[in-house]
Amino acid sequence: SGVHMILIKNGRVVDPVTGVDEVMDVLIDGTHIEEVGHNLSAAGAEVIDAAGLVVAPGLVDTHVHFRDPGQTYKEDILTGAAAAAKGGFTTVVCMANTKPTVDNVETLKYVQEKGEKTGIHVLQAAAISKGLKGQEMVDMDALAEAGAAGFTDDGIPIMDEKLLLAAMEKARDLDMPISLHEEDPLFVKQAGVNQGRISEQLNYGGASRTAEDVMVARDCMLALHTGAPVCIQHISSANSVEIVRMAKKMGADVHAEATPHHFTLTEDAVLKYGTLARMNPPVRTENDRLKIIEGLQDGTIDLIVTDHAPHSAEEKAKPLAEAPSGITGLETSLGLGLLSLVEPGHLTLMQLMACMSKNPAEFYRMIPGSVTQDAPDRKSVV
């Protein structure tokens, strides 16, 4: 038929959708998985011996910045997608803080069309407020209709509770996820570095964990009140993990993301790496890091995302107070999950795969990829 058949032999299939974790063969017919089983053979197929390797569904990163449109000297949809594919990600969701903002259907369509030129699924979240100004709600109906993956003003907190309440009610009615960057500027003297031992040492204002905690508490209660599917983005504070845990027990449809930098690094990284370790919210203390890992262990935190946020070398070469916040992550995320979570025994490989594939897909209303059952996207990663 001219279709390229690939037979992956002896790989450990780890599928968070079905719970299958066993050594099996996988036959790929061009673009889809034809058969999964034992002792498979196929005439003319290219055979890959995957002994000692893992075969899993494509990874899903629901929090990336591809800087496109408007800041493509940092990254663009094509380079971002290449980094994603290299890291094992077959689907990403881009944030809306581009220039112009993705607060209208035209800009959304631009990203979708450029995304189709890549080898992965590039989805785009829409802003909650026009121009990310936090004052006027976007046309959520039109953006949902046009295929927005969800709604978020990521990068900026929504201080206007009335606006957020209306947005949550609309998100609930649309059954669309609403994702929130939680940093109250009242408690942020200088962004990007935790307020504490290191910020004092560097004579830098810093961002207090209270900035996150007060917003997370408010928005967990708004989520409980509205019933909206809400995601607390890139959680960084031990107290915030506990607040989400409590809200889940109360019955809120609230979810939380952790990034590799927040479960691997602490504020000491700023001394070692300078501006490269500057991000919003900042990496904090060892206690915060361990509480984030506990949150991943018990399911309080159910998504692992990169918050892949590239900048130019020139920008990061500026002094700490002037350099932009953000760190890249697509090519290192899986490795850090394996090294920092699975190898020390904090999570099983199955739990890691759920956090990096099934859970983010389901929260963003996609059908999660599976190796062992029929799914529209059965791309596998070795």
Each predicted region: which residue ranges?
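Divalent metal-coordination and catalytic microenvironments
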Residues: 11, 26, 31, 52, ...
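Metal-associated gating/positioning segment near the N- to mid-region
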Residues: 51-115
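Divalent metal-binding segments
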Residues: 65-74, 93-105, 126-137, 152-163, ...
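A glycine-rich helix N-cap at a beta->alpha junction
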Residues: 113-128
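Histidine/acidic residue-rich metal-binding segments in metalloenzymes
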Residues: 137-304
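His/Asp/Glu-enriched, well-ordered alpha-helical/loop segment
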Residues: 201-229, 276, 297, 302-304, ...
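Conserved small/polar residues in nucleotide/adenosyl-binding loops
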Residues: 381
